[in-house]
Structure formats: structure tokens, C-alpha cells
């Protein structure tokens, strides 16, 4: 097959400072190419990366992008010129796999010339745009909660919506042995933003810390607004909130093997997101599971696609007025039960292997073949 893929305007693909979506999309593109398909990947231009190259069998085209802002409506406007440029550069293909706000709408206008089937990669919670996508052939959501939201907003789409979860590179995110006795190393990795529930996390850890002597919490992630963070003032607010609790802040890690090493160096990975209409899947908790870290997540529905409370991880009620207290109690229970942590770690690592890039690349390709046959 000839497959053309386009990511969004705000982050480059690796080896640039890619987001999770750009990273996993690049992985899928390489797997498609390795299976003999002709693959083109359109992404944002980045200093030090050529505008055109072939890498891992994938033809890369890089276009002028934009800096993201803290305002959703501004980002939607900024997406338009990039999507217009990408729509003009999409090559003739059997499948166009598109992940940008305006691009599916614009691409549908020229599909007759290119003869492509249009697949929308629904990596993010919908913002009403699916009403514009009547010309597409498939909408592939990364979680059941995203699929349900799309159908709610655009009921016409129900017959063409399916779910294929985000993949992780299980050759990089490999499990490491842990003792779980003694002080524990807690880690959050993600954007430093209020919607990630970090105030709940810091308050909860500060309450739990006296019962877990020697245990530490590291908060690692992008804080700059251009990278999706909330800016330096919010980081200082979190530092003040932490007080004397053993909490350390670190800059984001974009290089994959270094990030995997950071996950292997922690015991418990906490991802307390409160983004009811922002969280779509949760790649970071799944990658943490793959390394043997025990994931602790909020009760957002998207996490249930890979995490079962008490079996492969733990869930706390982030919607409760006592969310910090709920989290603190859970951290103490886990921190004083090493055998439970060992069981959760083993089950989580085994479950994460079901999300390997090779397995999910084959699911995508089978779906494309079915579209073309139909």
C-alpha cells in the first residue's frame, strides 16, 4: 500500500522534541515501511532536521509549523495554515492517515484527485470538529472513551469509528527488577499544567510522606507554554505547595531511551490527570507499566482500556472533594505492601506487552486493507 501520514503543527517528529503522538506515529510509519509499504510522513519543520529525507524507509516532508499557546481557540486557528499546506503536499496514496484539526476537512476536498481513503487518527478528545469530517472513510480512536465522545458529538460517524489503542515500543520500554522494600521512588512525567492534577499529587504526597520515610517524588515535564506547560509561575506555585516535602522538579526528557531509564528508576508512577475532556489514552502510564513501575492514575475512563484497578495498577477518585486525601491513603497502602506492589508490577508489565508497536501496526494495516477491499 501507499500510505501518507500527517501529524500536527506544534511538535516535530523524532529526533526533535516530539510529543507522544509524534513519537508513536513515527514508530508506526517505520513499521509500515518495514512491511514493504510506501510511506510518506508529513510533520512540523524543526531546526537541525532536513525538510526532506528518507529515514527507516520512510519519506519525510517537514513543513512550517507554529508554537502552541495556552488558548485552545488560538491553537485551532494556528492549525489552519499548516493543515492547508499539508493538504496540498499530500501525495497520491491508498490511505491518508491524518492527525491535525483542519486537515481531514481540507483533504476531503481533493481526495478524488489522489484516490486515497481518509483515516482520521483520533489521538485527542474531540472538540466538535468531527461534524466537519463527513468526507472521511474511517475514524480510529485511541480509546473507547474518545470513540464514545466522537459518536456523541457526531452521531453520523458511528459506522466508521473503531478503536485501536496507542502503541508503545516494548523493545525500549522493558521491565527492570524492583525490590519495593524500603523507601519508594514516586514519579510523575508529563506536562506541568493544572489539568494534570499536580496540586492533588503534591498535597497527597505531602500527607503520605511522613508514613513513608525516605520516599521521594520527582515531577518531570515540560513547563514552558510553547510545549504545553503552564509557565514558570505555575512551577513556583507547585514548589511552594510542596513545602518541605521531598519533591524534586526536573526538565522534560524527550530522548526515548533516557526516558525509559527514568521510568525504570522509579517504583510507582503517578498520573493524576483531571482533564475530563483532554485526556485521551495515557501513553506515559502504559510505558511506565511496561518497565515494571506500578501506575497510579485518576479515575478518567480512558485509562481503563489498559489498567485494571487492583490488578495492573491502582486508581483513585480524583473527582472527590477529598481527592488529595484519597491519593495519600492509596500511596500509603501501596508503600507499606511490597508484595502487592510486586504483583501489580508483574501483571502490569505483562499487560503492557499487548500494546507493542508491531502488534498494533498490523491491526492498522489490516483495517486499511479492509477499507480498500470495501
Name each model feature, range by range.
Residues 294-297, 307:
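Short hydrophobic beta-strand element within catalytic cores of glycosyltransferases
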Residues 231-257:
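Nucleotide-activated donor-binding/catalytic signature segment of Leloir-type glycosyltransferases, i.e.
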Residues 333, 339-354, 366:
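A short, well-ordered alpha-helix in the C-terminal region of glycosyltransferases
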Amino acid at each position: 500500500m501507499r500510505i501518507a501520514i500527517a501529524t500536527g503543527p506544534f511538535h516535530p517528529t523524532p529526533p526533535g522534541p516530539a510529543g507522544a503522538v509524534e513519537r508513536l506515529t513515527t514508530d508506526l510509519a517505520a513499521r509500515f515501511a518495514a512491511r514493504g509499504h510506501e510511506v510518506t510522513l508529513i510533520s512540523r519543520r524543526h531546526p537541525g532536521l532536513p525538510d526532506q529525507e528518507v529515514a527507516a524507509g520512510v519519506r519525510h516532508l517537514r513543513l512550517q509549523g507554529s508554537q502552541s499557546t495556552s488558548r485552545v481557540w488560538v491553537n485551532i486557528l494556528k492549525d489552519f495554515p499548516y493543515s492547508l499546506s499539508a493538504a496540498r503536499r499530500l501525495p497520491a496514496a491508498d490511505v491518508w492517515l491524518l492527525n491535525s484539526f483542519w486537515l481531514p476537512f481540507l483533504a476531503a476536498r481533493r481526495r478524488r484527485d489522489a484516490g486515497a481513503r481518509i483515516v482520521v487518527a483520533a489521538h485527542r478528545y474531540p472538540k466538535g470538529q468531527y461534524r466537519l469530517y463527513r468526507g472521511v472513510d474511517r475514524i480510529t480512536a485511541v480509546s473507547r472513551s474518545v470513540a464514545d465522545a466522537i459518536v456523541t458529538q457526531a452521531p453520523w460517524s458511528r459506522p466508521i469509528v473503531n478503536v485501536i489503542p496507542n502503541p508503545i515500543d516494548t523493545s525500549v520500554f522493558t521491565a527492570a527488577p524492583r525490590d519495593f522494600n524500603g523507601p519508594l521512588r514516586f514519579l510523575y512525567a508529563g506536562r506541568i499544567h493544572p489539568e494534570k492534577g499536580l496540586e492533588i499529587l503534591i498535597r497527597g504526597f505531602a500527607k503520605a510522606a511522613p508514613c513513608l520515610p525516605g520516599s521521594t517524588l520527582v515531577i518531570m515535564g515540560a513547563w514552558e507554554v510553547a510545549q504545553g506547560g503552564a509557565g514558570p509561575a505555575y512551577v513556583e506555585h507547585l514548589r511552594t505547595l510542596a513545602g518541605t516535602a521531598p519533591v524534586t522538579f526536573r526538565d522534560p526528557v524527550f530522548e526515548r531511551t533516557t526516558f525509559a531509564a527514568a521510568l525504570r528508576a522509579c517504583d510507582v508512577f503517578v498520573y493524576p490527570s483531571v482533564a475530563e475532556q483532554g485526556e485521551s489514552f495515557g501513553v506515559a502510564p502504559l510505558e511506565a507499566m511496561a518497565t515494571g513501575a506500578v501506575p497510579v492514575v485518576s479515575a478518567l475512563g480512558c485509562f481503563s482500556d489498559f489498567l485494571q484497578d487492583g490488578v495492573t495498577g491502582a486508581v483513585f477518585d480524583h473527582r472527590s472533594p477529598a481527592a488529595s486525601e484519597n491519593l495519600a491513603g492509596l500511596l500509603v497502602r501501596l508503600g507499606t505492601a511490597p508484595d502487592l506492589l510486586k504483583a501489580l508490577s508483574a501483571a502490569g508489565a505483562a499487560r503492557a506487552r499487548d500494546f507493542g508497536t508491531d502488534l498494533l501496526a498490523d491491526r492498522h494495516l489490516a483495517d486499511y486493507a479492509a477499507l480498500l477491499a470495501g
